[in-house]
Amino acid sequence: MLRIADKTFDSHLFTGTGKFASSQLMVEAIRASGSQLVTLAMKRVDLRQHNDAILAPLIEAGVTLLPNTSGAKTAEEAIFAAQLAREALGTNWLKLEIHPDARWLLPDPIETLKAAEALVKQGFVVLPYCGADPVLCKRLEEVGCAAVMPLGAPIGSNQGLETKTMLEIIIQQATVPVVVDAGIGVPSHAAQALEMGADAVLVNTAIAVADDPVMMATAFRLAVEAGLLARQAVPGNRSTYASATSPLTGFLEALA
């Protein structure tokens, strides 16, 4: 069970809505993933119409919507987009994204922190997408963010947990949930994140661009469950030296 702010989730896999070939395929993949929290870019939906091709099936599916501010380049733009989303969707939950460079889509740490502080004061439940910077994540936590969402690698790159060392520090020091976001390309990346101690992962591109998104969504669901179970089971310690599982000493002595 995962708790963020005033909501609890059985699934530790969050999903996105971009890049799917159709709305129907998107919904089928989300259902297969077991995800209960789904992000959607406000620039891709008509917030005035609940029968929007993307929004309507999500509402029907009963998932928690997490509008994001993707496309915002400044704190001011993100705050304005957040206010529009709250008015249109009736939710104060927000994935805060500010990336001024469309080529790399890396989050702006200064604008993100500024916007996060302002939005928390306005009553938003803020989940900021940010770099894997332990100091920044701590600052975001201190201004009241409900979780932090550090990247594993650039958005849509499928590179995996390239920031593993920094993620480990963030996880160790965090007192709010840590959701690894961006760069997760295959289910084993998601399992690794949960094994490390992350509370959840957010996956979009890896599912949406797969030849079979529904099958890939299922694979991610199972991987997240496996990673969480492995962590709860408490793996054995790593060792430089070998340790035989079936020592021969007693056996050979008995034959002598």
From Swiss-Prot:
It is an enzyme of class 2 (transferase). CDD domains: ThiG (cd04728). It comes from the Bacteria. Disulfide bonds: none annotated. 1-deoxy-D-xylulose 5-phosphate binds at G156, A182, G183, N204, T205. It catalyses: [ThiS sulfur-carrier protein]-C-terminal-Gly-aminoethanethioate + 2-iminoacetate + 1-deoxy-D-xylulose 5-phosphate = [ThiS sulfur-carrier protein]-C-terminal Gly-Gly + 2-[(2R,5Z)-2-carboxy-4-methylthiazol-5(2H)-ylidene]ethyl phosphate + 2 H2O + H(+). Pfam families: ThiG. One of its GO terms (cellular component) is cytoplasm. One of its GO terms (molecular function) is thiazole synthase activity. InterPro entries: Aldolase_TIM, Thiazole_synthase_ThiG, ThiG. This is Thiazole synthase. It comes from Salmonella enteritidis PT4 (strain P125109). The gene is thiG.
